[in-house]
Amino acid sequence: MSVKGMAIALAVILCATVVQGFPMFKRGRCLCIGPGVKAVKVADIEKASIMYPSNNCDKIEVIITLKENKGQRCLNPKSKQARLIIKKVERKNF
Protein backbone atom coordinates (compact mmCIF):
# COMPACT_ATOMS: atom_id res chain seq x y z
CA MET A 1 0.00 0.00 0.00
CA SER A 2 1.32 3.42 -0.84
CA VAL A 3 2.03 6.10 1.72
CA LYS A 4 -0.96 8.10 0.49
CA GLY A 5 -3.27 5.08 0.94
CA MET A 6 -1.93 4.44 4.45
CA ALA A 7 -2.44 8.09 5.38
CA ILE A 8 -6.07 7.97 4.20
CA ALA A 9 -6.70 4.71 6.09
CA LEU A 10 -5.19 6.18 9.26
CA ALA A 11 -7.30 9.33 8.92
CA VAL A 12 -10.48 7.26 8.52
CA ILE A 13 -9.64 5.17 11.60
CA LEU A 14 -8.92 8.27 13.69
CA CYS A 15 -12.17 9.93 12.59
CA ALA A 16 -14.14 6.78 13.41
CA THR A 17 -12.76 6.63 16.95
CA VAL A 18 -13.51 10.31 17.59
CA VAL A 19 -17.04 10.16 16.16
CA GLN A 20 -17.89 7.07 18.22
CA GLY A 21 -17.98 9.15 21.43
CA PHE A 22 -20.43 11.81 20.18
CA PRO A 23 -24.11 11.48 21.08
CA MET A 24 -26.56 11.07 18.20
CA PHE A 25 -28.83 13.84 19.47
CA LYS A 26 -27.96 16.86 21.58
CA ARG A 27 -31.12 16.54 23.60
CA GLY A 28 -32.53 13.16 24.51
CA ARG A 29 -36.10 12.19 25.08
CA CYS A 30 -37.57 12.73 28.49
CA LEU A 31 -40.42 10.55 29.70
CA CYS A 32 -42.33 13.56 31.06
CA ILE A 33 -43.54 16.22 28.65
CA GLY A 34 -44.06 19.60 30.27
CA PRO A 35 -43.64 20.52 33.94
CA GLY A 36 -45.97 17.84 35.36
CA VAL A 37 -48.72 18.03 37.96
CA LYS A 38 -48.15 19.53 41.41
CA ALA A 39 -49.78 16.75 43.42
CA VAL A 40 -51.56 13.40 43.22
CA LYS A 41 -53.86 11.85 45.84
CA VAL A 42 -51.68 9.67 48.05
CA ALA A 43 -54.38 6.97 48.14
CA ASP A 44 -54.15 6.64 44.33
CA ILE A 45 -50.36 6.04 44.25
CA GLU A 46 -49.25 2.49 43.56
CA LYS A 47 -45.57 3.14 42.79
CA ALA A 48 -43.18 6.07 42.49
CA SER A 49 -40.14 6.13 40.21
CA ILE A 50 -37.42 8.73 39.98
CA MET A 51 -35.41 9.17 36.82
CA TYR A 52 -32.23 11.14 37.44
CA PRO A 53 -30.53 13.24 34.74
CA SER A 54 -28.77 11.11 32.14
CA ASN A 55 -27.74 11.14 28.50
CA ASN A 56 -31.39 10.72 27.51
CA CYS A 57 -32.85 13.55 29.59
CA ASP A 58 -31.14 16.39 31.44
CA LYS A 59 -33.70 16.81 34.24
CA ILE A 60 -35.08 14.88 37.22
CA GLU A 61 -38.40 13.18 36.50
CA VAL A 62 -40.79 11.88 39.16
CA ILE A 63 -43.18 9.35 37.64
CA ILE A 64 -46.17 8.13 39.64
CA THR A 65 -47.98 4.92 38.70
CA LEU A 66 -51.61 5.07 39.76
CA LYS A 67 -53.70 2.20 41.15
CA GLU A 68 -56.47 0.46 39.23
CA ASN A 69 -54.78 0.87 35.84
CA LYS A 70 -55.35 4.63 35.80
CA GLY A 71 -52.00 5.14 34.10
CA GLN A 72 -49.03 7.27 35.08
CA ARG A 73 -48.57 10.91 35.99
CA CYS A 74 -45.46 13.04 36.03
CA LEU A 75 -45.00 15.15 39.14
CA ASN A 76 -43.29 18.51 38.95
CA PRO A 77 -39.95 17.76 40.69
CA LYS A 78 -40.06 21.19 42.34
CA SER A 79 -43.45 20.56 43.99
CA LYS A 80 -43.66 19.79 47.69
CA GLN A 81 -45.08 16.29 47.15
CA ALA A 82 -42.37 15.39 44.63
CA ARG A 83 -39.60 16.56 46.96
CA LEU A 84 -41.03 14.38 49.75
CA ILE A 85 -41.21 11.37 47.43
CA ILE A 86 -37.63 11.92 46.26
CA LYS A 87 -36.43 12.01 49.89
CA LYS A 88 -38.32 8.79 50.73
CA VAL A 89 -37.01 6.94 47.70
CA GLU A 90 -33.44 8.10 48.34
CA ARG A 91 -33.65 6.96 51.98
CA LYS A 92 -35.03 3.59 50.89
CA ASN A 93 -32.28 3.06 48.29
CA PHE A 94 -29.38 3.96 50.58
From Swiss-Prot:
Residues 1-21 form the signal peptide. GO terms for cellular component: extracellular region; extracellular space. Coiled coil: none annotated. It is found in: Secreted. PROSITE patterns: SMALL_CYTOKINES_CXC (PS00471). One of its GO terms (molecular function) is CXCR3 chemokine receptor binding. Disulfide bonds join C30-C57, C32-C74. Induction: By IFNG/IFN-gamma and IFNB1/IFN-beta. Induction by IFNG/IFN-gamma is enhanced by TNF in monocytes, dermal fibroblasts and endothelial cells, and by IL1/interleukin-1 in astrocytes. The modification Citrulline is found at R27. GO terms for biological process: adenylate cyclase-activating G protein-coupled receptor signaling pathway; cell-cell signaling; chemokine-mediated signaling pathway; chemotaxis; immune response; inflammatory response; positive regulation of release of sequestered calcium ion into cytosol; regulation of cell population proliferation. Keywords: Chemotaxis, Citrullination, Cytokine, Disulfide bond, Inflammatory response, Secreted, Signal. High levels in peripheral blood leukocytes, pancreas and liver astrocytes. Moderate levels in thymus, spleen and lung. Low levels in placenta, prostate and small intestine. Also found in epidermal basal layer keratinocytes in skin disorders. Pfam families: IL8 (PF00048). Belongs to the intercrine alpha (chemokine CxC) family. Chemotactic for interleukin-activated T-cells but not unstimulated T-cells, neutrophils or monocytes. Induces calcium release in activated T-cells. Binds to CXCR3. May play an important role in CNS diseases which involve T-cell recruitment. May play a role in skin immune responses. Interacts with TNFAIP6 (via Link domain). PANTHER family: C-X-C MOTIF CHEMOKINE 11, SMALL INDUCIBLE CYTOKINE A. This is C-X-C motif chemokine 11. It comes from Homo sapiens. The gene is CXCL11.
